[in-house]
Structures are given as C-alpha cells and as structure tokens.
Amino acid sequence: MRFVLDTSIFVNPEIRRKFGDNPTEAMRTFLGYAEMLFGRVEFYMPPGIYREVMHFVDEDELLPEIELYIIKKPPNVHDIKIPAFVVYELIDDIRRRIDKGLRVAEKAVRESVIETDNVDRIIQKLRRNYRKALREGIVDSKEDFELILLAKELDATIVSADVGILTWAQKMGIKWIDAANFREVLEGLVAKMGEGKNL
C-alpha cells in the first residue's frame, strides 16, 4: 500500500490539529504511525512538497525518522502519459476561470465608482474574490501537479485537503483520501496489522 502525502496534512490548521498543535508535532505523530506500518505501507512525497513541509517543521527534532519513513521521489515526467481529455478539461477550466475573474474585476470597478472613499476595501475584496475565482479547485502549482503525477505513476493513494488536487485526482482515476480522515485511516491500518490481517 502506498500513499503520496500533501503539505496540507501538516500545515493546514484544521487538518493538522488531528495530529498535533504545530507542524513539527503533527509530523512527529505521523512518523509514529509510519514506524508502526513500516514494511507494509510506504509514504511518498515529491521533492517540491517535501521542501514545502520542511519550511514548517523543525527538521532536527524529526531526524532520522523523517528520512527513514518518508520516501522522496520525483515523478518520472518523461514516461507518464496523460490522456488528452485532461488537457481539454484543463483548457476549458482555465477559460471559465478567466471569464469569472474578469466578472469579479468588473464588479469591483463598478463598486469603486460608486464608493470612491472605500477603494482600499474594494481592492482587498477584489483580490480575495479574484483569487477564489481563479485558484480554488484547480491544480495551481508545479508541486501539486508533481503530487498527482507521482500518485499516478505509483498507483498510490493521494492524501490531501486541497480541493484542486482531489478534483484532478478524481478526473485522472487516482485513488485519494481527504486529509481530514487520514489519522483515522492510519489508526485503522495499525489495528488491522495488529490483528495480523492483510493490508
């Protein structure tokens, strides 16, 4: 059994809380599960995701376990085939998002003409809504794309709370687990292993 891990498990406060009060504590708790499952379950991170996580944790507190239990592997970008429909969907999605972003900008301009004394507030609202229109639900970074490609290559399960990653995992037929449920999944795997059941 293989899992490809996203940063959201350790960084997103709502998700991380199940593992610990801060990213280092959350990673330490996860590594405890990884140790119990060692040899039966593999945990992967693409290098970009690993670097992101390392910005948030105290690496010295997690050595050597973090090196033992998390496999850092880039996807083989030269050999992975992506179906043409994925590119079509991506282009269509980007076009819809650009149009939606344009409507958000137009609305902000109209509001600023009416409320000239609240321009800063309107700009803040524009940025928030524009970001939401363009980025929510889409793979918006190279690191996110590497995560998806690696899971595809390994036939692994993605663990993430990122809506864009999970949406594209579904579109590409990749198994996934919402990071909000990951601790319970790990506990279930440890229990099955303790009972001598196959994973």
From Swiss-Prot:
GO biological processes: tRNA 5'-leader removal
Domain of life: Archaea
Molecular function (Gene Ontology), one example: ribonuclease P activity
Keywords: Endonuclease, Hydrolase, Nuclease, tRNA processing
S-S pairs: none
Catalyzed reactions: Endonucleolytic cleavage of RNA, removing 5'-extranucleotides from tRNA precursor
Family: Belongs to the HARP family.
PANTHER family (UniProt xref): RNA-FREE RIBONUCLEASE P, UPF0278 PROTEIN TK1425
Function: RNA-free RNase P that catalyzes the removal of the 5'-leader sequence from pre-tRNA to produce the mature 5'-terminus.
Name of the protein described by the UniProt record: RNA-free ribonuclease P
